[in-house]
């Protein structure tokens, strides 16, 4: 099994000494979320928490990815941020590929390829030929619908394409702790997908607890979602 992975806690997820709940109480996350959905980067919506912006900077500095693949584009703010941060850290010819079923991007950037595609059918747009040509290290960011089926489809698609040392980050499992009833519609999709995926493929992955717990236990919007390929 993966490091930290094994039995079911009270919330029904399959994870041992790594409960998904964060040290930050739900009502405080609610207030943080109010700011997250108003956050912009270079005049584009950039819905990342302050914790995750800082955690991503640690990961980018350590991993030095040459390619970032983002599933879920929105207005392209995070894709642009990743491209800029890779450039700032001296990456040679940084590349970002951002896939969305309904892209609404109004700009172009030579470092970024915006592709139209379904998280449940990524092989149609991220072909074997394309994946084999990617320059490593690779960082994958799963930020699509936050529903279980899409999250699980993304994890399953990338599993055979990841090399040792590559990362895949499953975003927004924190929806399970936000108190607005609207978030119940996600049915804890990201966390359930991470738990089930690690139950099947756990020998091949490690939860990077140094990133998850940089500011306290799972003080991130991506609890137990920072996964490193062994």
What spans do the regions from the language model cover?
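A short alpha-helical cap/connector motif
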Residues: 1-230
């Amino acid at each position: 099994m993966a490091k930290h992975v094994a039995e079911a806690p009270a919330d029904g997820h399959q994870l041992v000494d790594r409960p998904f709940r964060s040290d930050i109480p739900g009502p405080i996350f609610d207030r943080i979320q109010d700011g997250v959905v108003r956050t912009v980067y270079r005049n584009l919506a950039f819905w990342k928490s302050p914790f995750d912006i800082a955690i991503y900077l640690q990961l980018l500095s350590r991993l030095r990815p040459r390619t970032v693949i983002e599933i879920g584009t929105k207005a392209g703010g995070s894709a642009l941020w990743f491209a800029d941060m890779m450039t700032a850290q001296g990456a040679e010819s940084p590349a970002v590929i951002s896939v969305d079923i309904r892209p609404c991007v109004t700009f172009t950037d030579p470092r970024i390829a915006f592709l139209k595609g379904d998280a449940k059918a990524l092989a149609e747009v991220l072909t074997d030929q394309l994946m084999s040509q990617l320059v490593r290290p690779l960082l994958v960011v799963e930020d699509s619908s936050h529903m279980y089926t899409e999250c699980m489809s993304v994890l399953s698609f990338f599993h055979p394409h990841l090399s040792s040392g590559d990362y895949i980050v499953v975003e927004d499992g924190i929806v399970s702790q936000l108190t607005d009833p609207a978030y119940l519609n996600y049915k804890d999709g990201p966390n359930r997908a991470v738990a089930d995926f690690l139950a099947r493929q756990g020998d091949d992955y490690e939860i990077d607890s140094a990133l998850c717990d940089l500011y306290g236990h799972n003080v991130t919007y991506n609890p137990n979602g920072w996964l490193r390929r062994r």
